[in-house]
């Protein structure tokens, strides 16, 4: 699986001398290549409950996803993102990989028949830092304030050797200044490879 970290280990049963090992390099190779078309697609969004985005220049998470702790080897590829402005506000949207969340934490729940756990923003959580792997702008005057985007990124969800799982977060930042009382909704579609 491409998601898990490489690991070296040396052990001693207690009867031999102390030993050491020097790690020089490692590689992961897929024989036969990848079949990008094989997999099961899944979808989730925040339904009929928009996320309040009250302050311009503040980044609000709309949706978050991570691997279930029992499915760390599953290859998950985001396919499509859709964002809708429920107000007459413009946004910059961002797709974050392992962002820093302020104001609390996500409440993840299992997505049915999937390797993913999902969470939705609540208007109190914000993002202060993190790796942005995709983004764009949504103009409320165009297409009813909606935006869609096909995701094309090789960054996959995985975990650290201690089991800490990566989190992918779709977020928006209202443009302008001061209090804007904006709200937005989003959906995400992804594929789990077989």
Residue ranges and their predicted role:
Residues 1-194:
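Beta-strand-centric surfaces of beta-sandwich/beta-rich domains
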